[in-house]
């Protein structure tokens, strides 16, 4: 048998494994080691089996040098870290790759179980919620919440740094990634209530919420609604209520969420242009990361319930009343948990100018504008974002 054959190791690692998360899944994941060889893992009803070769259209394709693939399968190198380090690329269903990575036993690897990123699911507010977990199980909980039309994979850059000291949980929002959509009305308060339900199912102590964009708004709503459950907040370019540019409110208000049920296909080129536009300098990120993100976006919006959820969330953020008894900006001063706001100097979606309004509403909060940064600081400036986050956490 050639020494570059990964099949025996794949079979050894997958022998006897079962994933409840994959119980209803039939899929194929292909490992490709350059031009050397290809192996496929067939997933069916929670179990996985390996073989040589590749199907014509695999669900997911993982590419890396053979030594990297070998280390990942052996459990010596977390697949998430290999992806973040640019040593491994994923095309297709990224969530499937994360789930399969969790099947490889890494209990003997350096760092023990605390170095792992697990995939899990829980019922939160009646919604089957898919989430990632990393770090010591008895450490203080930190919850990462992603933005609109993304998945928990968009929070991956923060997990390695935070999971050394904290128990990190990263759920998919309802109607995103692996979390089901049960309601068409995905207003910010609804997402805040769902997030509180998730906390109560997964933790027994107050958690720090770290949210990007819509995830930041959901975190704010959770803290406003139930401050006793929230130890602190780190808001990365949070989707606050519009104070101006509300001319289209009458039209958007009568536009039903069901419009999104139409099977409209978003051209990949258009989606890519929109994604790259979120960054101050799109060249900072490898092309492989953009491709993986677009694959996830296409997968999410290809399903009707998810399209409804994404459109509903977008519509409700725009329609949010800025002022008045139920208005966001008049409720914000009642926020009591400590909060750190990070804004992107060149954010085209949530302008950094919102920082001064937040500072007026929350004199006890802290706002930092990150220079040369767009809407996704955890990807564009991961080290600085992690550094500021850890400093904030240490002060709680």
Features from the language model and the residues they span:
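Feature captures hydrophobic
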Residues: 1-119
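Alpha/beta-hydrolase fold catalytic core
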Residues: 95, 99-142, 164-166, 203-205, ...
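Active-site loop/oxyanion-hole signature of alpha/beta-hydrolase fold enzymes
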Residues: 124, 170-210, 214, 246, ...
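Conserved HGGG/HGGXW glycine-rich cap/lid loop of the alpha/beta-hydrolase fold
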Residues: 127-178
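Flexible "cap/lid" loop of the alpha/beta hydrolase fold
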Residues: 224, 233-265
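Conserved alpha/beta-hydrolase catalytic His-Asp/Glu region
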Residues: 266-331
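Acidic catalytic loop of the alpha/beta-hydrolase fold
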Residues: 322, 346-350
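Short beta-strand/loop motif that positions the catalytic acidic residue
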Residues: 335, 341-343
